[in-house]
From Swiss-Prot:
Binds 1 zinc ion per subunit. GO terms for cellular component: cytosol. This is Cysteine--tRNA ligase. HAMAP family: Cys_tRNA_synth (MF_00041). The keyword Nuclease does not apply. InterPro entries: Cys-tRNA-ligase, Cys-tRNA/MSH_ligase, Rossmann-like_a/b/a_fold, tRNA-synt_1_cat_dom, tRNAsynth_Ia_anticodon-bd. It is an enzyme of class 6 (ligase). Zn(2+) binds at C34, C230, H269, E273. It comes from Brucella ovis (strain ATCC 25840 / 63/290 / NCTC 10512). Its main location: cytoplasm. The lineage of its organism: Bacteria, Pseudomonadati, Pseudomonadota, Alphaproteobacteria, Hyphomicrobiales. It is found in: Cytoplasm.
Length: 506
């Protein structure tokens, strides 16, 4: 850890407090985040945890060194929704081939979309279908320890059996008792369950569905429940490579540092992950810190297809900024729109609900244009080290306070501190070197234009606006437009001050 690095503090859902982060092993900092179920295009709500935990990944690498951080984000490629989509989209194909087409194409689209949003690739992205052995072994251990049982070719976990043992209590993460959870839950009260709160670890596959050899002596083919997948994959990627796993009796080696996801996953998914992992591995905790990002709304309403406001990441990249027009290379255009979406999301603290609006996206794009314009004017180069990003790092070390970090970037821009601006943007994943150095970026085209003269005209127009001389202000705007220069007015979201940018139009 750099001597100058501030203390990283993170809000822990498990304890409901902001805690100083102390890794189990500073040379092997480990984080697991629940990833996509690959059956459909990812929506902008799915983008939020990807961006939030990418910022944390970057911060951990900055503090502890890139080679000392492992970030695992899973891919769920076994699910009823995948089966339904495969049957709908590829009815003429053999079912397993149809499923493979759905998962491969959807995952490829997800990877392209989140890359356009400025995210690094996680260290590992385990797929559920690649870890069936670990799932079966973990389920067998849970049955052996008496917290899971076999019924009608299903294997179920018993929270009440867990609570009868020494160790963590079921419901500690959600802070609800079994009775409270049962009262508020819509659970499948199947006849083979011993108790209503029991949940599925493994279930038999129906005819034609994908299936694998079952655990616990079950002879029919089956497939895993949702929750066991993440317990097994986190064990495979964050415990076993570092000496932990089912063969290890050391509790410290059988837990990792951070587990993240959306607030909607606290119960039942994360609660059930904890139950499975702690009972199988003999630990008090699965992860030391649990982090959850807040919900997302669109223009003040819950996002839903029925309201007509369901927005995918691809929608934002393709159509979110129509003023960009067509570029020669639309993958580059996607990256610019993705950076604007990233900045828009990071203006809300990750634990707070976020209101996605077209106006904020456009304002974020304009602000990025100003920042990159300064970096281009000053010949900023891609930094090898982030030695001037201390203000942004300090803000992010306070429970990922991205709003304070953006305020630091705005201050750096205001005083033209190019190193602090560029390196701070890099730490937040907002710096794409291409947009700094490339000469043919459409939004930075300034052919045969005197930038200083335009700046003087803009200043003159601002004086007229302040004097409420609207006619003269409009005259300058119209004259510039006739010369091929379009002015764009907006407000600084922090200060409320008018900001005027310009672009060359045909």
């Amino acid at each position: 850890m750099p001597d100058t690095a501030p203390q990283l503090r993170l809000y822990n859902t498990l304890t409901r407090t902001k805690e100083a982060f102390a890794p189990i092993d500073a040379k092997n900092v480990r984080m697991y985040v629940c990833g996509p179920t690959v059956y459909d295009f990812a929506h902008i709500g799915n983008a939020r945890p990807v961006i939030v935990f990418d910022v944390l990944f970057r911060l951990l690498r900055h503090v502890y060194g890139a080679q000392h951080v492992t970030y695992a984000r899973n891919i769920t490629d076994v699910d009823d929704k995948i089966n339904a989509r495969a049957a709908r989209d590829y009815p003429d194909l053999p079912f397993n081939e149809a499923i493979r087409k759905v998962t491969e194409s959807t995952n490829a689209q997800f990877q392209a979309d989140v890359t356009a949003l400025g995210n690094l690739q996680p260290t590992v992205q385990p797929r559920a279908t690649e870890h069936m052995d670990e799932m079966r072994a973990m389920i067998d251990r849970l049955v052996q320890r008496g917290v899971a049982y076999v019924a009608q070719d299903h294997v179920l976990f018993s929270p009440s059996a867990m609570d009868a043992r020494k160790g963590p209590r079921y419901g500690a993460l959600a802070r609800r008792s079994l009775d409270e959870m049962l009262a508020g839950a819509r659970v499948d009260v199947a006849s083979y369950k011993r108790d209503e709160m029991d949940f599925v670890l493994w279930k038999p596959s129906k005819k034609g569905e994908p299936g694998w050899p079952s655990p616990a002596g079950i002879e029919t083919l089956g497939r895993p429940g949702w929750h066991i997948e993440c317990s097994a994959m986190s064990m495979a990627k964050l415990l076993e490579p570092f000496g932990g796993g089912l063969k290890c009796d050391d509790p410290e080696r059988n837990q990792f540092d951070i587990h993240g996801g959306g607030i909607d996953l606290v119960f039942p998914h994360h609660e059930n992950e904890i139950a499975q992992s702690c009972c199988a591995l003999g630990t008090e905790r699965m992860a030391n810190i649990w982090m959850h990002n807040g919900f997302l709304q669109v223009e003040g309403q819950k996002m839903s297809k029925s309201l007509g406001n369901f927005i995918t990441i691809r929608d934002v990249l393709n159509d979110g900024l129509p003023q960009l027009g067509e570029w020669g290379d639309n993958t580059v255009r996607d990256r610019w729109a993705g950076l604007a979406a990233r900045l828009s999301m990071l203006q809300t603290h990750y634990r707070e609900p976020i209101n996605w609006t077209a106006q904020r996206l456009a304002e974020s794009a304009d602000e990025l244009h100003r920042w990159y314009g300064l970096l281009r004017d000053e010949g900023f180069g891609a930094p090898e080290k982030l030695s001037h990003a201390s203000a942004v790092a300090a803000a992010l070390c306070d429970d990922l306070n991205s709003w304070a970090a953006i305020t630091a970037l705005r201050q750096a821009f205001k005083v033209r501190d190019v190193a602090a601006l560029g390196e701070g943007m890099a730490l937040m994943g907002l710096l794409d070197p291409y947009f700094v150095t490339a000469s043919d970026v459409p939004i930075f085209a300034r052919a045969d234009v005197d930038a200083s003269a335009i700046a003087a005209r803009i200043a003159e127009r601002l004086n007229f606006i302040n004097a409420k001389n609207w006619a003269e202000a409009d005259r300058i705007r119209d004259e510039l437009l006739q010369e091929g220069v379009q002015l764009k007015d907006s407000k600084d979201s922090a200060t409320g001050e008018r900001i005027t940018t310009w672009d060359v139009v045909g």
